[in-house]
Amino acid sequence: MSHRAIWRESIARRKYAIVFEDDAVIRGDVRDVLPPLVSQLADNWDIILLGYNTNSILDLKLSDGGIDFRGHFSVQYPTLVQLSAFVASKEAVEIYKLNGAFGLCGYAISPRGAERLISTCFPMDKRVIPIPALGRSIVSSGLDSILNAFFRQVSAYACFTPLVVPINDPSSSSVLQA
């Protein structure tokens, strides 16, 4: 099922949805950790990234004073050993306002968020998207890149440390590259 189809289902049922892509590696404690994090936000959130690709940037808002975290991961493509350790991890997780990230390996979306993102992301096109954490703009190549144009405009959040990471193996990816 496509992301957009899941979003439409969320809207139709007026229910929140949690989405995991087929290459998602999920921490073993996600069921214990996620509900208290979400409850911190009350009901005014659109999307919460539970994880993101480790081969690109993560850009989080730390304060209203303009202090952001912009970083890269030490391992772009985790090994199976590293992914196994991740599943067993019990590192502290907090939730932050999201400015930018790539990858949709795992996320929660509200019906309101689904409506807002469907109306802003589709139809998908080759729009130019500024990525401040990269210091440049990119031409969108998929839904996760298009979302970067809207994370700052909607109530988007991300878990850090992540609760989900993708296998993200470029040799077996089903994502078409130009």
What residues fall within each predicted segment?
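An acidic/histidine-cluster motif and surrounding catalytic segment
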Residues: 1-20, 24-178
